[in-house]
Amino acid sequence: MRALLDTSVVVAGTSITVDSAAVSVITIAELGYGIGHQPDPFERSRRSLCLSRIQELYEPLPVDVIVADAWAQLAAYTAACGRQPRRRAFDLLIAATAQAHGLTLLTRDEDLLWLSDVLDVRAV
């Protein structure tokens, strides 16, 4: 299986066995935000090391026009299902990245599993 690791999987340090794995540039942004807003210097340092390790292990997949188109479709689907796409914009961008690249989205975020009707998303 070729997979995209959701931020929740990266943060948890979940051990995953897949043929190949990737992360989204959105995950890099979310991790950086978490570092910048962490008041505890020890936790900030731990998170910085985690981010450095992720950047060494993976070449983040960018948000490009194909991902943007996939996001627009997922956001419209989300709204049609009565959910708020803007509240989950980063999650939907990560999901769109998986969809655009034909990857399985691996997540620990149960709120993403409802996308399984339109995306290969699996809980880990």
Provide a role label for each language-model segment.
Residues 100-106, 110-113:
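C-terminal structural segments of small proteins and small subunits
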Residues 2-3, 13-96, 114-124:
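PIN-domain endoribonuclease scaffold, especially VapC-family toxins
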